[in-house]
Amino acid sequence: MSQNIVIVGASGRMGRVLIEAVLDAPGARLHAAIDRADSGFVGQDAGLFCGRSSGVFISSDFIAALDGADVVIDFTRPEGTLEHMLACVERGVRMVIGTTGFDDEGKAAIRAAAGKIGIVFASNFSVGVNLTFKLLDMAARVLNEGYDVEIIEAHHRFKVDAPSGTALRMGEVIADALGRDLKQCAVYGREGVTGERDPQAIGFATVRGGDVVGDHTALFAALGERVEISHKASSRATFANGAVRAARWLSDKRNGLFDMQDVLGLR
C-alpha cells in the first residue's frame, strides 16, 4: 500500500526535489505539499517544479494536510519543524526530519515526540554519506594513536547553519569511536596565535560559496602520512531519494527514534 506523504517547504531547494522524488517513487503518493502563505506558489500544482502535473495543489494549511497523511517529510528550519512535529504527535502522523541546526532542547523535544510517533531524524539522507559514517567509525578505531582529526565541509552560499549537521555527525561518530566527548574536544575554526594543536582535538573548518551541494572530508593526519575519507554530493536528489526511502521504511513503526543507519540496516 502506498504511503501518503506530505512535503513541507514545497518551494524550497529541498522541497522541490522531494516532490519529484515522491512522484517517481513506487509505494509513495504525494498527499500534500505545504508552503508559506506568502510564497506565491500556493494554489499552483506541486508538479510545476519538475515539469509535470501532479494533481496536488500547494497549500499553506499544514493541519488540514495531515488528514489522511501517513508521513510528513520536513527539511525546513528548526522552529518550524518543532511546530509541525507537535501537530503530527497530536494526530499520530509519522515524520522524516532532515532539518539541521537544532539545539540540545530541540533534539530533546524530538526524542520525546518519538515516544508517541515514529520519527527518522538524520543529518544526511544520502546512502553514500551513511556508508561514510560507517567507514569513519572503522577508521577512527584503527587510527586511534598519533593521528590528528580535522573535518572540512563546504556548502552553497545560502546555507544558514555551520558547521553542517553532517560534519557534526561525522565528528560525533569519530569521537564516539575514540572514546571522546565531542562537546569537550571540538574546535570550531582557528585564528591568530593558537599555539600547538591539542592532540585530543577534533577540528572543524567551514566553507560557504556558490552552489556547492555538499562536500565533506574527514582528515586523519599523522607524521609521515594522512588518510582522507570524503563524500561529495552533486545533486540534492540523493538526499530526497533517501528521505522517501525512510518514509516508506517507517510504515510499520508506530513509534521510536531512528536514523538512516537503521533504515539502511547498517547497525
Swiss-Prot record:
Gene Ontology BP, a term: lysine biosynthetic process via diaminopimelate
Binding locations of NADP(+): R36
One cellular-component annotation, GO: cytosol
Annotated metabolic or biological route of this protein: Amino-acid biosynthesis; L-lysine biosynthesis via DAP pathway; (S)-tetrahydrodipicolinate from L-aspartate: step 4/4
Catalytic site: H155 (proton donor/acceptor), K159 (proton donor)
SUPFAM superfamilies: Glyceraldehyde-3-phosphate dehydrogenase-like, C-terminal domain, NAD(P)-binding Rossmann-fold domains
Binding site for (S)-2,3,4,5-tetrahydrodipicolinate: H156, G165, T166
Subcellular location: Cytoplasm
A molecular function (GO) term: NAD binding
Pfam families: DapB_C, DapB_N
Catalytic activity: (S)-2,3,4,5-tetrahydrodipicolinate + NAD(+) + H2O = (2S,4S)-4-hydroxy-2,3,4,5-tetrahydrodipicolinate + NADH + H(+); (S)-2,3,4,5-tetrahydrodipicolinate + NADP(+) + H2O = (2S,4S)-4-hydroxy-2,3,4,5-tetrahydrodipicolinate + NADPH + H(+)
Source superkingdom: Bacteria
EC assignment: 1.17.1.8
Binding annotation for NAD(+): G9, A10, S11, G12, R13, M14, D35, G98, T99, T100, A122, S123, N124, F125
Leading EC class: oxidoreductase
Keywords from the named record: Amino-acid biosynthesis, Cytoplasm, Diaminopimelate biosynthesis, Lysine biosynthesis, NAD, NADP, Oxidoreductase
Family: Belongs to the DapB family.
Function as written in the Swiss-Prot or TrEMBL entry: Catalyzes the conversion of 4-hydroxy-tetrahydrodipicolinate (HTPA) to tetrahydrodipicolinate.
NCBIfam families associated with the record: dapB
Name of this protein: 4-hydroxy-tetrahydrodipicolinate reductase
